[in-house]
């Protein structure tokens, strides 16, 4: 077919022009009208989001696990660590200053460290290279000191928080001393609070008797509860080294500030509209008034509770053997070591002289009465089994008087192995770990509650009056309460505080007083004011 030469020439010119425009547009993608789809493969930046993490992980693996490219050897207690100046300097200002200074360590191939143990330095290496470290209670204070010295700030702060959460009677003075040396105000405050609220337990310990003067002054000037006998503690500290410390006597007595305790009594119970338990803390004033100073929610099915050294301990929940402590310094709930076995309706009793909590009797999950006795060493966070009770009981009242636990009433087995209300008094001596049953019985039986005042045990039971039990004379004295209470039987609870006996009603009608205060010296009964607790089922009252 013949092609028109003029048409062919025009078509070639058009094609040539279109090709030149296309090439020009590809060379100049910034010009208006350029297509993003056409420029996608011409100008594209790829960013690997996992690159930095992969490089860091790979580098640490090469450096630590395969021990490649090590350029410094750190010797600690004879063990040599093959490490890297760059990694150490990146994480620690201490090592950065060491390696960039004119000191001999900047050029030596082997560096010996004298102020750290081998096991703790291994933990520091793990932290520096991997960012993780397993903190153990037995090494925590050394890790705290060394991390501050080597300027590992994040690790130091975490150790400080850990120590503040775990400070207790057994280590509070040591932790306070430690925090003072390292200028750590948060940890110092937590340790000081523990020390001043447990001063009576600490005053004869080696740590207290060797306490520096400025730390003792800071403790007693911060407000010590009257119940901790701060004057006796001051005298004990002075008499330990009277020749040198007599000069501080007047200044210490002037600095002393005694206060009432913020939390005198804990009520544990339930509201009618709730299924879980509540712990309500009460402040008892000298004008016969009681005010609510706090409230904490607890788990379901609290089976036992006690107050030890100002802290609240409760056992129970979905797993009956679990135990928690409400730290009075931080108002946080902390897990404690669980009981060896699940137990229900057992009795928890605080024994401050041994810094221990005893669990006595109770029921197994198979509803069998138990005569087991175990005790929890607060300082060691460990439960230990000891001598059993003479008679298996559950739901008994417990009171500690001079190291002897009086277990009162509850339920015991009858001759047919059915349970019956008990009138027994069992005495467990925490010094000898021996138990015996009194040859006489209580004037009433069943579930009751008890509190110690001086050398007496005050007992209340369902639908009965208040009874004063004198273990030395083996006698009981019945004390009558107002007729309005006696006419409406209910399960009462009792607490001893500030030289007075407080009696709480479990249920009360609208308008009735729910708390009475008894003066044991005069037998005078007064109605307390200012409290309206909505708990309809008082499980425990702890003072």
UniProtKB/Swiss-Prot annotation:
SUPFAM superfamilies reported in the protein's UniProt record: Kelch motif, POZ domain
BACK domain boundaries: 172-264
Keywords tagged on the record: Kelch repeat, Repeat
InterPro entries per the UniProt record, alphabetical: BACK, BTB-kelch_protein, BTB/POZ_dom, KBTBD4, KBTBD4_BACK, KBTBD4_BTB_POZ, Kelch-typ_b-propeller, Kelch_2
Top-rank taxon, per record: Eukaryota
Extent of the signal sequence: none
Pfam family of the protein (one): BTB
Domain BTB: 70-137
Kelch repeat locations: 264-310, 311-353, 356-403, 405-455, 457-505
Record keyword Cell membrane present: no
The keyword Aminoacyl-tRNA synthetase belongs to this UniProt entry's keyword annotation: no
Subunit structure: Component of the BCR(KBTBD4) E3 ubiquitin ligase complex, at least composed of CUL3, KBTBD4 and RBX1.
Name of the protein in its database record: Kelch repeat and BTB domain-containing protein 4
Lineage of the organism: Eukaryota, Metazoa, Chordata, Craniata, Vertebrata
């Amino acid at each position: 077919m013949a092609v028109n030469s003029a048409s062919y020439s025009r078509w070639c010119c058009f094609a040539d022009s279109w090709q030149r425009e296309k090439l020009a547009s590809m060379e100049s993608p910034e010009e208006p009208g350029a297509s993003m789809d056409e420029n996608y493969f011409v100008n594209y930046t790829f960013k690997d989001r996992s690159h930095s993490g992969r490089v860091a992980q790979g580098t640490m693996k090469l450096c630590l696990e395969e021990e490649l490219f090590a350029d410094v050897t750190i010797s600690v207690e004879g063990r040599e660590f093959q490490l890297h100046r760059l990694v150490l300097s990146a994480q620690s200002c201490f090592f950065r200053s060491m390696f960039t200074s004119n000191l001999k360590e900047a050029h030596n191939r082997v560096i010996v460290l004298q102020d750290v143990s081998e096991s703790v330095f291994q933990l520091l290496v793990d932290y520096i290279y991997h960012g993780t470290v397993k903190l153990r209670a037995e090494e925590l204070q050394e890790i705290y000191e060394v991390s501050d010295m080597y300027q590992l700030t994040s690790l130091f702060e975490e150790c400080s928080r850990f120590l503040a959460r775990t400070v207790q009677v057994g280590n509070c003075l040591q932790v306070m001393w430690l925090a003072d040396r390292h200028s750590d105000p948060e940890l110092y405050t937590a340790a000081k609070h523990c020390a001043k609220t447990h001063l009576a337990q600490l005053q004869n310990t080696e740590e207290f008797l060797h306490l520096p003067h400025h730390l003792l002054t800071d403790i007693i000037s911060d407000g010590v509860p009257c119940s901790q006998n701060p004057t006796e503690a001051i005298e004990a500290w002075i008499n330990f080294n009277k020749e040198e410390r007599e000069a501080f006597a007047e200044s210490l007595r002037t600095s002393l500030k005694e206060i009432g305790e913020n939390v005198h009594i804990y009520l544990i119970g339930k509201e009618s509209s709730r299924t879980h338990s509540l712990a309500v803390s009460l402040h008892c004033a000298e004008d016969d008034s009681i005010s609510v100073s706090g409230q904490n929610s607890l788990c379901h099915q609290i089976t036992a509770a006690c107050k030890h050294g100002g802290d609240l301990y409760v056992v129970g929940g979905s797993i009956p053997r679990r135990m928690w402590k409400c730290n009075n310094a931080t108002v946080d709930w902390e897990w404690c070591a669980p009981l060896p076995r699940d137990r229900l309706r057992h009795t928890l009793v605080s024994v401050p002289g041994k810094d221990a909590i005893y669990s006595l009797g109770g029921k197994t999950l198979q509803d069998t009465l138990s005569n087991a006795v175990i005790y929890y060493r607060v300082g060691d966070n460990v439960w230990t089994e000891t001598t059993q009770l003479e008679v298996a009981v559950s739901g008994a009242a417990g009171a500690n008087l001079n190291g002897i636990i009086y277990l009162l009433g509850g339920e015991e087995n009858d001759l047919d192995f059915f349970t019956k209300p008990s009138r027994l008094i069992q005495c467990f001596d925490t010094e000898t770990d021996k138990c015996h049953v009194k040859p006489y019985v209580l004037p009433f039986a069943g579930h009751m509650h008890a509190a110690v005042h001086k050398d007496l045990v005050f007992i209340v039971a369902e639908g009965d009056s208040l009874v004063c039990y004198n273990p030395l004379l083996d006698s009981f004295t019945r004390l009558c309460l107002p007729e309005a209470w006696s006419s409406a039987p209910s399960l009462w609870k009792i607490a001893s505080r500030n030289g007075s006996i407080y009696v709480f009603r479990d249920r009360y009608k609208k308008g009735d007083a729910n708390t009475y205060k008894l003066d044991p010296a005069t037998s005078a009964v007064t109605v307390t004011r200012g409290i309206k607790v909505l708990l309809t089922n008082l499980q425990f009252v702890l003072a």
